């Protein structure tokens, strides 16, 4: 029984060494590929973006629709950079200044789930900075009453 355990332990140690060596080789290959990729990327000139970089948003309610359109357009043409909701929200946050930046700090401090949900983050911004999507619907209903 003890001999079997010793043999098993020896076999496991040998397997561990072999896997460690293989892992080291793979990590070296990965390092070389990352360096090669960086070198190739420096040689390639990225195409110019047809949509300008969005302006910052300071919390001024009248600018919120413009800010959302600018950022959405920019993210659409650069979709490879914004592959998930967390990246989109982080991009929006990077453009906030003043009152808007102060507004987002508590969400960051408590690591709110809203930071990983683009739609929810936009809805929260709209609610805070005074953009109501239902405004047009209410106007239509009032017109129907007359």
Curated annotation (Swiss-Prot):
It is found in: Nucleus. GO terms for cellular component: nucleus. Coiled coil: none annotated. May have an important role in the development and/or progression of some cancers. Interacts with NOD2. Belongs to the LDOC1 family. This is Protein LDOC1. Pfam families: DUF4939. One of its GO terms (biological process) is cellular response to lipopolysaccharide. Keywords: Nucleus. InterPro entries: DUF4939. Disulfide bonds: none annotated.
């Amino acid at each position: 029984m003890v001999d079997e355990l010793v043999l098993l332990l020896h076999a496991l140690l040998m397997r561990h060494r072999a896997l460690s060596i293989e892992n080291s080789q793979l990590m070296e290959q990965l390092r070389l590929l990352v360096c090669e990729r960086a070198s190739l990327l420096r040689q390639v000139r990225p195409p110019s973006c047809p949509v300008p970089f969005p302006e910052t948003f300071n919390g001024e309610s009248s600018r919120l629709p413009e800010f959302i359109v600018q950022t959405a357009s920019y993210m659409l043409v650069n979709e490879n950079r914004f592959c998930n909701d967390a990246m989109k929200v982080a991009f929006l946050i990077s453009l906030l200044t003043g009152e808007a930046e102060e507004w987002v700090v508590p969400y960051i401090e408590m690591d709110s789930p809203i930071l990983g949900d683009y739609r929810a983050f936009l809805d929260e911004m709209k609610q805070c900075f005074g953009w109501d999507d239902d405004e047009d619907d209410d106007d239509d209903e009032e017109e129907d009453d007359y």
